[in-house]
């Protein structure tokens, strides 16, 4: 059958393959056509990086499927992933790796399914389809891994005008995450938000569970006046 391989330069290569061909075989065919050594090739299909020992049929790659070829930067880089238990995992990655790829590597090392992983860097939750370089994650950067509790929960946020906003959250969400969700719904920048629960102002770096905020709790939103303290 024929498949297509699209490079980052936009060039498309046509290959004659069999469903039983391994990814390694495919890389050899690409080398024959383009002169790129297999160890510098990374093949992506449906957002997944393909492993050398697996076959096209393992990945359900059928005739006229398009694979994406990304060149592996020599050497790649190491990053660290710190879990809530304090354990630090070291990963070999490339700047062009997607967050989804990184979660797959964490699954390989730790057995945690990607859909239960949330990765945080510089206070931001990282989105699956974006790459490390999109977030300016460089060698020896540290990401934080938070486990997503299945199902999450609803909380309410009441504004001074009396309006109540409903949010879908997880106990492990930081206050910063909650402010980002409020910004998404209401357009209020996080730096203008102050959140109050049980008479306490909530700090950005802490989580809902730190403050014992449970399902259907109500937070109060006070707007911070520009230039105020």
Swiss-Prot record:
It comes from Homo sapiens (Human). Changing residue 74 to G: No effect on ADP-ribosylation. GO terms for molecular function: protein tag activity; ubiquitin protein ligase binding. The keyword Metal-binding does not apply. The record marks 54, 72 as: Interacts with activating enzyme. Residues 229 form a propeptide. This is Polyubiquitin-B. CDD domains: Ubl_ubiquitin. The modification Phosphoserine is found at residue 65. The modification ADP-ribosylglycine is found at residue 76. GO terms for biological process: energy homeostasis; fat pad development; female gonad development; female meiosis I; hypothalamus gonadotrophin-releasing hormone neuron development; male meiosis I; mitochondrion transport along microtubule; modification-dependent protein catabolic process. Ubiquitin is encoded by 4 different genes. UBA52 and RPS27A genes code for a single copy of ubiquitin fused to the ribosomal proteins eL40 and eS31, respectively. UBB and UBC genes code for a polyubiquitin precursor with exact head to tail repeats, the number of repeats differ between species and strains. The mRNA encoding variant UBB(+1) is produced by an unknown mechanism involving the deletion of a GT dinucleotide in the close proximity of a GAGAG motif. This variant mRNA is found in normal brain, but the encoded protein accumulates only in brain neurofibrillary tangles and neuritic plaques in Alzheimer disease and other tauopathies, as well as polyglutaminopathies. UBB(+1) variant cannot be used for polyubiquitination, is not effectively degraded by the proteasome when ubiquitinated and ubiquitinated UBB(+1) is refractory to disassembly by deubiquitinating enzymes (DUBs). The gene is UBB. Pfam families: ubiquitin. Keywords: ADP-ribosylation, Cytoplasm, Isopeptide bond, Membrane, Mitochondrion, Mitochondrion outer membrane, Nucleus, Phosphoprotein, Repeat, Ubl conjugation.
